[in-house]
Amino acid sequence: MKVAVLGAAGGIGQALALLLKTQLPAGSKLSLYDIAPVTPGVAVDLSHIPTAVEVKGFCGEDPTPALEGADVVLISAGVARKPGMDRSDLFNINAGIVRNLIEKVAATCPKALVGIITNPVNTTVAIAAEVLKKAGVYDKNRLFGVTTLDVIRAETFVAEAKGVDVASVKVNVIGGHSGVTILPLLSQIEGVNFSDEEVAALTKRIQNAGTEVVEAKAGGGSATLSMGQAAFRFGMSLIRGLQGEANVVECAYVDGGSEHAVFFAQPVLLGKNGVEKVLPYGEVSAFEANARDAMLDTLKGDIQLGVDFVK
């Protein structure tokens, strides 16, 4: 199994690479790429950790050597949010970065499962899809927007609010990966009940959690460690699916034939072909149905921005 991390010298990439080095199945290969010249050094640093995972680092303009033979590609390259920015402010820089990297993926490892972490995910996934289509290698079952950070935040905040064991909390988060497009389905969580006020407050906190971190870091960055862990969880689920493990389910932002938008985050069953099945997200409350319907214009606009960027 070979996993490539593109953007490996950044805060998310380094956290993700550390977790992968310590947790990937024995015999795996971990390939790190970033434009920054420090990247081979990050690989050397990680190589001193005693696990049976081979690490190599690559830097410069061309990620091709890092991508050769990759089964899974996780892309976190791009600029981070600063205070006062929202995820859409990142579009002008990150759109071009994702386009260029996906062109190389299309040429080098078109069958790889690709997880896009680079924000704004609502738009960058659409960019990736259009680039892959142009190259004639698009497979909607192999492209994912990684929304797992919304899921782990929801799990954490619910457990804190209700004083329950976080391991017992399972939350589906649907829609997209910014602001109002993030919709945790709190009504479905077993064993806990919320007042209307609690639902409204928790939903807003989950939607704005990224800003909470950006402001707390006071200009020093955005969510890197929690995003690294979320990307690791999702990446490992992709690998478990590839290895034939049954019943591997994660929420992800996919081109899954949703009635709501071309790309929509919802639970997916993962397997040897990436998405084996898009799963229904179940019954929702009136609050959730209203929030879902209210987000769709924003989500569709984000997607169209990506389509137009490539055209």
Curated annotation (Swiss-Prot):
E.C. number(s) listed in UniProt: 1.1.1.37
CDD domains: MDH_glyoxysomal_mitochondrial
Active site as annotated: 177
InterPro entries membership: L-lactate/malate_DH (IPR001557), Lactate/malate_DH_C (IPR022383), Lactate/malate_DH_N (IPR001236), Lactate_DH/Glyco_Ohase_4_C (IPR015955), Malate_DH_AS (IPR001252), Malate_DH_type1 (IPR010097), Malate_DH_type1_bac (IPR023958), NAD(P)-bd_dom_sf (IPR036291)
Domain of life the protein comes from: Bacteria
Any one Gene Ontology molecular-function term assigned to this protein's record: L-malate dehydrogenase (NAD+) activity
Record: residues binding NAD(+): 7-13, 34, 94, 117-119, 227
Keywords: NAD, Oxidoreductase, Tricarboxylic acid cycle
Catalysis performed (reactions): (S)-malate + NAD(+) = oxaloacetate + NADH + H(+)
Binding site for substrate: 81, 87, 119, 153
One GO BP: malate metabolic process
EC supergroup of this enzyme: oxidoreductase
One GO cellular component, as annotated: cytoplasm
This protein's record includes keyword NAD: yes
Quaternary assembly: Homodimer.
Functional note: Catalyzes the reversible oxidation of malate to oxaloacetate.
Protein name, per record: Malate dehydrogenase
Biological source species: Shewanella amazonensis (strain ATCC BAA-1098 / SB2B)
Gene coding for it: mdh
